[in-house]
């Protein structure tokens, strides 16, 4: 089994923000797997399905981003998953909009959701799918925290569906072919563009 965690904040106020890109990718995966409904479990929205021969658990924490680990740890523990079977999809300021990178382990780069998950799991050795949202424009008057809680720009929205699809493709590669093959394909593809 692989647990895919899409990070975001609960509630309609945050639904269209950059910080909720993980929820969008989880929803795309659920759609592809023909998940008919989510259920409330592990302090979030949860679905069990399959992708090929692999069992797949999808989780959208219902906690706020800064305490996402309170949802992730119970799910990973319940299914007795090794951390390399946990894939966390999150927004990444340090990548240009729509760029995707897969990696195993690493620091939190100031991302409070990752910080919480690492703290709760007691390790950072889980898989991350980093979805680029870019840095705020120079004329942006707020902080990075303000930026991630804003909606995507119109030009970004025009490309968002395709980019979310590419992120879901990358997760599918992890599930079907393993992390190394998925990293080789996904991370190389982005270098070529």
What label would you give each PLM region?
Residues 2-105, 114-130, 137-146, 150, ...:
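Nucleotide and nucleotide-moiety/phosphate-recognizing core
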Residues 108:
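Conserved mid-domain beta->alpha element of the FAD-binding
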């Amino acid at each position: 089994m692989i647990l895919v965690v899409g990070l975001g904040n609960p509630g309609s106020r945050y639904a269209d923000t950059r910080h909720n890109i993980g929820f969008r990718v989880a929803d795309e995966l659920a759609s592809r797997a023909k998940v008919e409904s989510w259920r409330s479990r592990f302090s979030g929205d949860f679905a069990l399905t399959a992708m090929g021969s692999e069992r797949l658990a999808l989780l959208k924490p219902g906690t706020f981003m800064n305490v996402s680990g309170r949802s992730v740890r119970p799910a990973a523990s319940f299914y007795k998953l090794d951390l390399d079977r946990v894939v966390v999809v999150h927004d990444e300021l340090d990548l240009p909009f729509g760029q995707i990178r897969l990696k195993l382990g690493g620091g939190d780069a100031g991302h409070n959701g990752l910080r919480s998950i690492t703290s709760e799991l007691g390790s950072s050795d889980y898989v991350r799918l980093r979805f680029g949202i870019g840095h705020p424009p120079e004329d942006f008057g707020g902080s990075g925290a303000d930026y991630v809680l804003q909606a995507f720009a119109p030009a970004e929205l025009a490309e968002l569906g395709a980019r979310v699809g590419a992120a879901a493709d990358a997760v599918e590669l992890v599930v079907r072919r393993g992390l190394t093959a998925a990293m080789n394909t996904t991370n190389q593809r982005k270098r070529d563009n």
